[in-house]
Swiss-Prot record:
Family recorded in the similarity comment: In the N-terminal section; belongs to the ubiquitin family. In the C-terminal section; belongs to the eukaryotic ribosomal protein eL40 family.
Molecular functions (GO terms): structural constituent of ribosome
Keyword Nucleus listed: yes
CDD domains per the UniProt record, alphabetical: Ubl_ubiquitin
Cross-link (Glycyl lysine isopeptide (Gly-Lys) (interchain with K-? in acceptor proteins)): 76
SMART domains in UniProt: Ribosomal_L40e (SM01377), UBQ (SM00213)
Record's miscellaneous remark: Ubiquitin is synthesized as a polyubiquitin precursor with 5 or 6 exact head to tail repeats. Some ubiquitin genes contain a single copy of ubiquitin fused to a ribosomal protein. This gene is an exception, since it contains for 4 copies of the ubiquitin fused to the ribosomal protein eL40. For a better understanding, features related to ubiquitin are only indicated for the first chain.
Ranges for domain Ubiquitin-like: 1-76, 77-152, 153-228, 229-304
Organism: Trypanosoma cruzi
A Pfam family annotated for this UniProt entry: ubiquitin
One example of a Gene Ontology biological process annotation: translation
The protein's name in its UniProt record: Ubiquitin-ribosomal protein eL40 fusion protein
GO CC annotations, alphabetized: cytoplasm; nucleus; ribonucleoprotein complex; ribosome
Length: 356
């Protein structure tokens, strides 16, 4: 029968073989065609590295199957694997090693079965059938090892429409994995998802364990709008700040953007919209804040001392009032008569005393 061998350069080699051929025989055929010594060849099929003494039939390799050829680098390299306990393991590997091979090496050193291992690099969970080279893992790179909990747990994801999704997960799942599960259930692409827990937006490369998300916890799903929108933030001094945001941004995110522009720490900011103070863990969508909406920024007072701008506002509010001498009703500064019937719309008014 005929099979194909694909190299990392994209070249495809056609080989005439039999199901009873050993992997060693196949490597010899590749040497005849391409001149690559068998000891520098690694053959991968269905995510597994093929062993020399086994046959094509052993791996269920049939006609027109495609094997992947990666070259064994002479000398190899050293990488590190860091566990959640802080322990660091040094491993001798080659760029052509599959993640499955790396897990086997970890098992040899630490006794952890491969099916309980999850390896993370640059915020991504590594897939068994891929190689270190596929992930651009080079000498002295550090991978992070998290353990796959047996049995897992159930968590819930609540959408803005009120729908609740149940997911089977493990504490070692990354946020990226959770988004993939949501995509499987709801068809929402991961790049349009934002997950919120305890008022914080969850980062793709972190795990549920990193955020102390436990069984039956509820995450909140908001959709990332393509292109975003512009809103305005008005301060008590009258200055207006324009911000580029998305409906799925949390109030905490908005405060961070204000800090970037104005240097005001988030813990000193209070944001007001439609007469309500906005809570950090909620999103702009929760408050129906849309494009070109205006939020009002007031500063959180430290130690009960009134900010100068707020004091000026209070004085202005008190100065520009009149008081009826009979019923003591507070009236607009332009009023000539009291609006209350009880005093007969008295015209005996005085200016309200100034705040000192």
């Amino acid at each position: 029968m005929q099979i194909f061998v694909k190299t990392l350069t994209g070249k495809t080699i056609a080989l005439e073989v039999e199901s009873s051929d050993t992997i060693e025989n196949v490597k010899a055929k590749i040497q005849d065609k391409e001149g690559i010594p068998p000891d520098q060849q690694r053959l991968i099929f269905a995510g597994k590295q093929l062993e020399d003494g086994r046959t094509l039939a052993d791996y269920n390799i049939q006609k027109e199957s495609t094997l992947h050829l990666v070259l064994r680098l002479r000398g190899g390299m050293q990488i590190f694997v860091k566990t959640l306990t802080g322990k660091t393991i040094a491993l001798e590997v080659e760029s052509s090693d599959t993640i499955e091979n790396v897990k086997a090496k970890i098992q040899d050193k630490e006794g952890i079965p491969p099916d309980q291992q999850r390896l993370i690099f640059a915020g991504k969970q590594l897939e068994d059938g891929r190689t270190l080279a596929d992930y651009n893992i080079q000498k002295e790179s550090t991978l992070h090892l998290v353990l796959r909990l047996r049995g897992g747990m159930q968590i819930f994801v609540k959408t803005l429409t009120g729908k609740t999704i149940a997911l089977e997960v493990e504490s070692s799942d990354t946020i990226e994995n959770v988004k993939a599960k949501i995509q499987d259930k709801e068809g929402i692409p991961p790049d349009q998802q934002r997950l919120i827990f305890a008022g914080k937006q969850l980062e793709d490369g972190r795990t549920l364990a990193d955020y102390n998300i436990q069984k039956e916890s509820t995450l909140h799903l908001v959709l990332r709008l393509r292109g975003g929108m512009q809103i305005f933030v008005k301060t008590l001094t009258g200055k207006t700040i324009a911000l580029e945001v998305e409906s799925s941004d949390t109030i905490e995110n908005v405060k961070a953007k204000i800090q970037d522009k104005e240097g005001i720490p988030p813990d000193q900011q209070r944001l007001i919209f439609a007469g309500k103070q906005l809570e950090d863990g909620r999103t702009l969508a929760d408050y129906n804040i849309q494009k070109e909406s205006t939020l009002h920024l007031v500063l959180r007072l430290r130690g009960g001392v009134m900010e100068p701008t707020l004091e000026a506002l209070a004085k202005k509010y008190n100065w520009e009032k009149k008081v009826c001498r009979r019923c003591y009703a507070r009236l607009p500064v332009r009023a000539s008569n009291c609006r209350k019937k009880a005093c007969g719309h008295c015209s005996n008014l005085r200016m309200k005393k100034k705040l000192r």
